[in-house]
Amino acid sequence: MKKILLFLSVLFVVSCSKDDLVEIKPDNQIVGKWHFNTYTIDNVDAVYDECKQKGYFLFLNDGTGQEVIYFNNSTYGCKLDSTKNLKWSFNGTEYDIKTFSGGSYAGVTSFGITYQYFGKISDEFLKIPVGYNETINLKKE
């Protein structure tokens, strides 16, 4: 009996290793308010100005949210530029984020536009590629 217990103990210790542990990140890690922080163009990082950093993506538990953009105008200063509704989902590796424009521009009714982004959370930043060599980096509040 002692030999069987010893064999089972050794088998248990040998069969488990750190490599077998898989870190699973929850899909709701994105929930909260993420402010514009930095952006990257051609592998060069730059910091958004104070006005742009007031803007954010807000992700809610129900898969909806808002994108809020501020713009610094030399005449009027830092002003709210746009607010868009969004929907988000998580496929296990990246976030699918869709923003929807309100269907008007400068008071003129037009068709609505949907923008689609794919983002990943890395080093406490939500990184969203937005162009060929461009990425916006948002930091959670």
Feature map (PLM): residue ranges:
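Positively charged n-region of N-terminal signal peptides that target proteins for export
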Residues: 1-4, 17-18
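Sec-dependent N-terminal signal peptides
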Residues: 4-13
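Lipid interaction determinants
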Residues: 17-85, 89-141
